C-alpha cells in the first residue's frame, strides 16, 4: 500500500518508537516569539543546559508589538516579554528578526518569506496556527511551552501519529469568493472538531490553482477544524515561491526529495471529504466560534442548544437576521491568516476611489515588514490612507487582545483573522470572520455586502 504525503514526511523524521505508539521526531525548524518562549529559556538556565540547535531556532516579535509606535511599548508585561526574548536570543545565540528589522513580522509570515519554511520539513512553534507552514508540504504544528523547552534541549519531540483525512476540493471559485471562504465553509459544515485526531491534506484542482498565499490561509485555520496538522502537496507553485529566498540555499539539492512529496495513488486515508466550490458564497461568522457562520445569502440559524443561545446573547444578534443586518463599527485587515500582499491587493481594488463609512474605524496591519515595504512600493499605503484607513506597522495586532489594538466592548468588527471567541479582540468585542475583500467592502459600506456583485 502506498503512503500519504503526511506518512512520507513523518517516517523520514522518526528517530525512535514503533507505529501505534508515541514516536520521537526530529525537528527541522523551531520558530519562536515573545509569549511562549520565556519560561522555556528559563528552564534551560535552571538545568544549566545549552540550546541544542541554535542554528535551527529563529525568533521574531509579533504578539505584543504595538503597531503605531513600535519603540514606545507602554504595557509593562508586553515590554518585559519583548526585552526578555531579545536578551534570550543574545544569550543563547538565536537569530532574531528584531523590532524594526527588515524581516520582522508575524511568525507565520516570517518563516515563508525568508525561505525558512520548506517542503518536507518538520516545523514547530509555540503558537496554535503553525499549520500555516503545512501549505508547503511540511509537517507543521503548534506546541506548548514545556514542549518548546524540550525542543530547545533536544531538537526532538515525542508525538503520536494522527490518522489521515483528505479534503478533496474541486471547481472554480466564483468572483468574490476566496480561500478564506473555503476554510470557513468547511468549518461551518463539519464543525470545529471534525479534524480532531487527523492530519488534514487539502487536495484537488481548486488547491492546485491557488497561490501559495491563498494556500497558507487554508492551512492556517486547520486548527479551527480541530486538526493539529494541515498540509498540501508541494508543486511548481511551491518551488517557485521558495526559490531565491535568503534561507533556501539548498534549493537545488532539495528538489529530488521535494518532488517525492505527494500522496501515492493507492495511499490509504481514514476519511475523505469532497467539496465542489463552484457555487460557494462569501462566508460570514455570526457567533463565537468559527463553526457559527453562514453563506452570505442565508439567514442566521435557529437556536439548537445553549451554546447557540449564549453566542446570540453575546453577539447581540438573533436567528433570522442576515449578515447585512449587522451594525459594524470596526474593520480589521490583518493577522497571520490574511495579511499578505495578495490579501491587501485584493482588498485595495474594492476601496480605490472610495471612502470609509463614517461609522467605521478601519485599520490595515501588514503581517510583516516585507509585506509592508512591498505594499508601499505599489502605493497601497496611500490608497488605503486616502480612503480613510489607518496604515499600521507589522504585528499580530487586533487578532487578539494582547496588545493596544482592541475592539471596544459591544462593537461589531469585520475581521480577516482566524478566531471569533468571546473577548478575542478585546473585552466584549464582537468578531465576524470574513475574507479581506468582504472586510474592505464592509469598511466602505458600513455593513456587509455581497461582494460578488462588485468584484469582476
Swiss-Prot record:
Q: Which cofactor does it need?
A: [4Fe-4S] cluster
Identify the domain of life: Bacteria
Question: InterPro entries this protein is in?
Answer: 3-IsopropMal_deHydase_lsu, Acnase/IPM_dHydase_lsu_aba_1/3, Acoase/IPM_deHydtase_lsu_aba, Aconitase_4Fe-4S_BS, Aconitase_4Fe-4S_dom, IPM_dehydratase_rel_enz, IPMI_cat
Binding locations of [4Fe-4S] cluster: 336, 396, 399
* Reaction(s) catalysed by this chain's protein: (2R,3S)-3-isopropylmalate = (2S)-2-isopropylmalate
Entry-linked CDD domains: IPMI
Matching HAMAP family: LeuC_type1 (MF_01026)
Q: What does this protein do?
A: Catalyzes the isomerization between 2-isopropylmalate and 3-isopropylmalate, via the formation of 2-isopropylmaleate.
What is this protein's name?
3-isopropylmalate dehydratase large subunit
Organism lineage reads as:
Bacteria, Bacillati, Bacillota, Bacilli, Bacillales
